[in-house]
Amino acid sequence: TKVIKYEDDSKIYKTNDEQTYIDKNLIDKNGDGYNFCKVKVRTLRKPVIGDKFSSRHGQKGTIGNIIPECDMPFTENGVKPDIIINPHAIPSRMTIAQLKETVLGKVLLYLGYFGDGTSFGDFEVKDICKMLQDIGFESNSNEILYNGMTGEQLESNIFIGPVFYQRLKHMVNDKQHS
């Protein structure tokens, strides 16, 4: 048996118009003594309509529309949301901790600190809301947004803040049969 010394020679391959990176190579023997090789690859993809995302609290959803950044609503400070979710999704899935993460994340973002936004943290919601008021926001984290296409003020205040979302494996490009 010839032994080949592995040298990390990560490469980029183009397959199906996608850049694919080789992260790891593993050459080993199984329990029966046969050689095997494992290759871990990763592909960079832009989100498309139908891709599935989830917050840390299990608030799942799929992309229903992709709007150019210039057309997204914006705050008085010029902050534009990356995603807009249906507010009815929070009570129906009972992901109330996501609201706590959003408000705490907004406070910590403006103060420049890190924090624990989980339900196991020692922050009380009323304390977080007080801190939000102290830095100049409404205690319920609502803000006035303006229409990105017309510049007009939206009719209602919008609950806005940072939340960590991650893409799930359910991607449209993997499910299409073309």
Which residues are covered by each model-predicted region?
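Intrinsically disordered, low-complexity regulatory segments
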Residues: T1-S178
